[in-house]
């Protein structure tokens, strides 16, 4: 009985580890595009809806003319299926809808791609994703390409993976989000109002408020082609 119990526990642990860390994530090719009426000469590439608010809203407000690419949450297949909101029965497209509302308020072009949102792993089809990013960057010579840093800001594995892919592609004028404790974001009042768009992410935004308060960017060195 003891051996059976230990084997059972081991199997459960293996299943949990596989589901959280090892399983391949859904990697779809569908793209939702919006606000194409707005001109864009700068490109922001983020992993999840709300990343643009937490790490890049100062830039979006201060320097209009952005196209924002959100890599995840394009369809029911690419939502985070182990998130609290999903498990509590929220509609499956809630984060996508919140992102679109934010883009409308900020007058940004946007695309939402169809890669699965997950906190614990980033096991996407990386060859496919890299090709998609390369095709995106060939569309236009952007004045700035702004994305996650190699540390993933607070260590998020999907942030790290997107940053690494863009470092490998090495587009001109590549910048990453940067936490600068010596600066204070001058748009905190406006950003607080905008944050209400992300009702589902209220706790996450409050938890990571310091990244909003001290938003900055930094150029990637040796990035000329």
Curated annotation (Swiss-Prot):
Residues spanning the membrane: 2-22
Compartments reported by the entry: Membrane
Species the sequence originates in: Acanthamoeba polyphaga mimivirus
Record: glycosylation sites: 73, 222
Domain of life: Viruses
Protein name in UniProt: Uncharacterized protein L374
Pfam families reported for this sequence: PIG-L
Keywords: Coiled coil, Glycoprotein, Membrane, Transmembrane, Transmembrane helix
Membrane topology: Single-pass membrane protein
Leader sequence residues: none
Coiled-coil zones: 114-146
A Gene Ontology molecular function term of the record: N-acetylglucosaminylphosphatidylinositol deacetylase activity
GO CC entries: membrane
């Amino acid at each position: 009985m003891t051996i059976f119990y230990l084997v059972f526990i081991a199997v459960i642990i293996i299943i949990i580890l596989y589901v959280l860390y090892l399983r391949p994530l859904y990697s779809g090719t569908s793209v939702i595009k919006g606000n194409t009426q707005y001109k864009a000469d700068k490109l922001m590439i983020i992993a999840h809806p709300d990343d643009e608010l937490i790490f890049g809203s100062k830039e979006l407000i201060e320097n209009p003319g952005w196209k924002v690419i959100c890599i995840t949450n394009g369809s029911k297949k690419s939502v985070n299926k182990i998130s609290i909101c999903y498990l509590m029965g929220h509609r499956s497209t809630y984060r996508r809808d919140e992102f679109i509302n934010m883009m409308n308020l900020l007058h940004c072009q946007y695309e939402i791609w169809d890669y699965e949102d997950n906190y614990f792993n980033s096991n996407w089809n990386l060859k496919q994703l890299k090709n998609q990013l390369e095709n995106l960057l060939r569309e236009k010579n952007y004045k700035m390409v702004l994305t996650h840093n190699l540390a993933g800001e607070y260590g998020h594995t999907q942030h790290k993976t997107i940053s690494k892919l863009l470092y490998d592609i090495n587009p001109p004028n590549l910048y990453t989000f940067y936490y600068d404790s010596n600066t204070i974001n001058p748009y905190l009042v406006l950003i607080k109002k905008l944050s209400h768009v992300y009702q589902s992410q209220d706790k996450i935004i409050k938890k990571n408020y310091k990244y909003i308060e001290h938003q900055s960017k930094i150029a990637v060195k040796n990035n000329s082609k």
